[in-house]
Amino acid sequence: AMVTKNNGDLDKSGTECRLYCKDNSPGQNNSCKMFYSNEDEHKGMVLPGTK
């Protein structure tokens, strides 16, 4: 079962869940997903609002 992750959720080790986007350009239909910051899947993705 997929667990729905929410911004600010903490995993067992206390790592915060954040929204990562593939493209940070304004107006893009960004493909955004929630990841814990210690997960590898968000490599190459960016946090919204960061350059």
Curated annotation (Swiss-Prot):
Where found? Secreted
The terms under GO molecular function for this entry are: metal ion binding; metallopeptidase activity; toxin activity
Instruction: Name the Enzyme Commission number(s) assigned to this protein.
Output: 3.4.24.-
* Highest taxon above the source species: Eukaryota
**Transmembrane domains' residue ranges:** none
Which sites carry carbohydrate? 29
Q: How is the cofactor bound?
A: Binds 1 zinc ion per subunit.
Expression by tissue, per the entry, reads: Expressed by the venom gland.
Enzyme class, broadest EC rank = hydrolase
On subunit structure and binding partners, the annotation says: Monomer.
> What protein name applies here?
Zinc metalloproteinase-disintegrin-like crovidisin
Q: What is the lineage of its organism?
A: Eukaryota, Metazoa, Chordata, Craniata, Vertebrata
